[in-house]
Each structure stands twice: as C-alpha cells, then as structure tokens.
A protein has these predicted regions:
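Conserved, well-structured functional cores that handle cations and Mg-NTP chemistry
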Residues: 1-140
C-alpha cells in the first residue's frame, strides 16, 4: 500500500497559498462561496491540465474515477460536479489566476539556474527517444 503523498499533491505543495489568498482577497474571489473555493478551482484546473483532459466533462469523469483519492490529492472532501466547476469558471474573476500565474513565473525566473554546473548535487539526463528494433524469429 502506498504510504507517500501523491505526485499531484507534492507538486501543489510548491504553490504559495498565502500569495494566492492575497489575490483572492484583492479581487474578492471567495465572496458568497460555501465550499468550492478559488483554491479548489485552481487545483481542479491544474489537475485537468496535467492529466491532459480535453473538456470539462472529461475532467469530471476523471474526478469521479478518483473520488476516493480526491482528499489526498488536495481537492477536498466534497465531490466536484460539472455545474459547480463551470459556474466557477464562468463567474469568478480571472485576474486572480492571471496574477498568480505571473507571480509564479516571476518566482521561477528568479530561481532558475543560469548554468547547469552551478546546481549542487548529482545531475541526471533522461532520454525518451524510442528506437525500432527489428527482430526475426526462425522456427525450425
């Protein structure tokens, strides 16, 4: 049985939630919200991007398939339904997510390495090229 955190929750741990909440307060994003907050919306849309979902319906099907793991992915305890997600996407201020994206890009630019040799520790290179191997088997 898996004892570690899921990869998605490990990725979202790098997001600065305090800064995101500042943008939510600035644009009053969680006003009149009962359960599906701006943070939940951000994580839901990130999950859709990272899992290569093509539509909202496809994303909701994926959430239903992972309903038991939804809390551990960081998406909360309540199921995410298409109507709620589409309403949030339509009515919430996009500037919350735009400003947060610009903030994250600024942080990434400041922390990037200009020379790979300056990074401490071991360096690994992964090659994902595929090769075609032609084999013939002769039966006698």
């Amino acid at each position: 049985m898996n004892q570690d955190k899921y990869v998605f929750s490990q990725l979202t741990a790098f997001l600065n939630r305090t800064q995101f909440n500042n943008y939510v307060r600035k644009y009053d994003g969680d006003r009149y919200v009962k359960q599906f907050t701006c943070w939940n919306q951000l994580l839901a849309m990130m999950f859709g991007q990272l899992s290569n979902r093509e539509s909202l319906r496809d994303l909701i099907v994926a959430f239903e398939a992972h309903r038991g793991k939804q809390y551990h992915l960081g998406l909360g305890r309540n199921p995410i339904v298409k109507a709620t997600l589409s309403y949030a996407n339509q009515n919430r201020n996009y500037r919350i997510f735009e400003d947060f994206a610009f903030y994250m890009m600024k942080e990434a630019c400041e922390k990037r390495a200009t020379n790979i040799l300056d990074i401490p520790g071991k360096k690994y290179a992964f090659d994902s090229t595929t090769t075609f191997a032609s084999m013939t088997v002769t039966v006698m």
